């Protein structure tokens, strides 16, 4: 199943390091495109604690009063408050109320309450969220630890080598893509044989090369092995610790953690998947998942409705080859029922940028004439005004074509893939031009 999007910082790092020598190169980003469950930082910290990995003392608060109470419980005069938003760049982000920074150092319970009240219930805008931002519903308050050394360590699933890898760098505590761009030799990849796992020798070698002091190497080795254990036992696709620190009292601590889990493992990881925060996800993508559709928004203006991930990718490719931009990835799967088609059209047309829809269906499991009935009824009931290009190939395709032609609906039935894609791009441009100059446009079918 084609899935988009992993941690963007990692993706940038993959791309940047593809130019580095093989020994220090991260896996290629083209091999890494995955869409997986992400969980909040405070939940990641809880999971690390369960496996005996050192993390700063802290807890989650959903009100200013709770934040104040947690800060009192932690004690001391050095703490950090972090907005719980599933996006990178929180520290440099800005809230919709003008507050700068989603990660701030605080020195008292009073400050904890003050900043919590300014963060909770407001949207944080970062370089990853886009202008719309993401709602902060909770804050994580933890003790501030001072590090003697900071490192970067991640356990990832690498499709190129068809197995897990450990990516490490002595330059932790900073933007990993910046390190990858400026100094790719500082990033190292260790390939793991799943039949052997992370041995003592391998983990100790990684810890030593990172630069942990002699008294911390064994604890760092144990931490690396525990991270790999979490990776395997919880069906993770990504565990990123940045920074993994050696504190001033020579303790190994995971100061910040990002987890990604394989969406296909939800049936055997119920405890993990109940941690999902759908308020942090695109509502249309959540709705699609509930309907059994694989839907991911993109930035273009040609809607795509396809059955099968491979055909969906080929459809997006040929749209781009003809000068267009797909507005979405949408795979209705083998069960392209009339109900699924209607749901798919509602999702596609909810995007105001969409100026044409390309329906590309191969009728193997489902008959093309059944698809045609669903398509015609959907276009009628939704009273769609934008052009629809339908390419229905396979079982009963002639009957499907006849149904569309006899329907009187403005659906362009085209058999050839190139011609259908070309027509989609051309009609999309016409509609976009009409919108730009604020005039109406109608289409007459040449059939």
Swiss-Prot record:
It is found in: Mitochondrion. Gene3D superfamilies: ATP-grasp fold, A domain (3.30.1490.20), ATP-grasp fold, B domain (3.30.470.20), Succinyl-CoA synthetase domains (3.40.50.261). Substrate binds at residues 307, 364-366. Residues 45-287 form the ATP-grasp domain. Keywords: ATP-binding, Ligase, Magnesium, Metal-binding, Mitochondrion, Nucleotide-binding, Transit peptide, Tricarboxylic acid cycle. Its EC number is 6.2.1.5. It is an enzyme of class 6 (ligase). Pathway: Carbohydrate metabolism; tricarboxylic acid cycle; succinate from succinyl-CoA (ligase route): step 1/1. Mg(2+) binds at residues 242, 256. Transmembrane segments: none annotated. Heterodimer of an alpha and a beta subunit. Belongs to the succinate/malate CoA ligase beta subunit family. GO terms for biological process: succinyl-CoA metabolic process; tricarboxylic acid cycle. This is Succinate--CoA ligase [ADP-forming] subunit beta, mitochondrial. ATP binds at residues 82, 89-91, 150. The gene is tca-9. It comes from Neurospora crassa (strain ATCC 24698 / 74-OR23-1A / CBS 708.71 / DSM 1257 / FGSC 987).
């Amino acid at each position: 199943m084609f899935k988009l999007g992993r941690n963007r910082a990692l993706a940038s790092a993959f791309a940047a390091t593809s130019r580095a020598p093989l020994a220090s190169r991260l896996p290629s980003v083209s091999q890494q495109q995955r869409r997986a469950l992400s969980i909040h930082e405070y939940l990641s910290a809880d999971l690390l604690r369960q496996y005996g990995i050192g993390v700063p003392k802290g807890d989650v608060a959903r009100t200013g009063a709770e934040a104040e109470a947690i800060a009192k419980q932690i004690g001391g005069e050095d703490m950090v408050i972090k907005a719980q938003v599933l996006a990178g760049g929180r520290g440099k982000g800005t809230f919709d109320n003008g507050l700068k920074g989603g990660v701030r150092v605080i020195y008292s319970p009073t400050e904890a309450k003050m900043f919590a009240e300014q963060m909770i219930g407001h949207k944080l805008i970062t370089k990853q969220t886009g202008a719309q931002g993401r709602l902060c519903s909770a804050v994580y308050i933890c003790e501030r630890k001072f590090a003697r050394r900071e490192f970067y360590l991640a356990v990832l699933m690498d499709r190129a080598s068809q197995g897990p890898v450990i990516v490490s760098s002595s330059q932790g505590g900073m933007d990993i893509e910046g390190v990858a761009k400026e100094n790719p030799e500082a990033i190292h990849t260790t390939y793991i044989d799943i039949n052997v796992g992370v041995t003592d020798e391998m983990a100790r070698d990684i810890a030593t090369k990172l630069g942990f002091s002699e008294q911390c190497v064994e604890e760092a080795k144990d931490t690396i092995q525990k991270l790999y254990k979490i990776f395997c036992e919880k069906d993770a696709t990504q565990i990123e610790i940045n920074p993994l620190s050696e504190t001033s009292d020579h303790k190994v601590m995971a100061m910040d953690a990002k987890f990604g889990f394989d969406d296909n493992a939800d049936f055997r990881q119920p405890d993990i998947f109940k941690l999902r925060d759908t308020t942090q996800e695109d509502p249309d993508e959540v709705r699609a998942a509930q309907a059994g559709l694989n839907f991911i928004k993109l930035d273009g203006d040609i809607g795509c409705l396809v059955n099968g991930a491979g055909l969906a990718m080929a459809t997006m490719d040929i749209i781009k080859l003809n000068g267009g931009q797909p507005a979405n990835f949408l795979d209705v799967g083998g069960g392209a029922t009339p109900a699924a088609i209607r749901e798919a059209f509602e999702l596609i047309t909810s995007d105001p940028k969409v100026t044409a829809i390309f329906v590309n269906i191969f009728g193997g499991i489902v008959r093309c004439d059944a698809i045609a009935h669903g398509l015609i009824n959907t276009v009628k009931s939704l009273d769609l005004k934008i052009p629809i290009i339908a390419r229905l190939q396979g079982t009963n395709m002639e009957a499907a074509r006849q149904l569309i032609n006899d329907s009187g609906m403005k659906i362009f039935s085209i058999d050839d893939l190139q011609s259908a894609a070309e027509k989609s791009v051309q009609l999309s441009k016409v509609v976009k031009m009409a919108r730009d100059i604020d005039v109406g446009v109608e289409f007459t079918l040449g059939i």
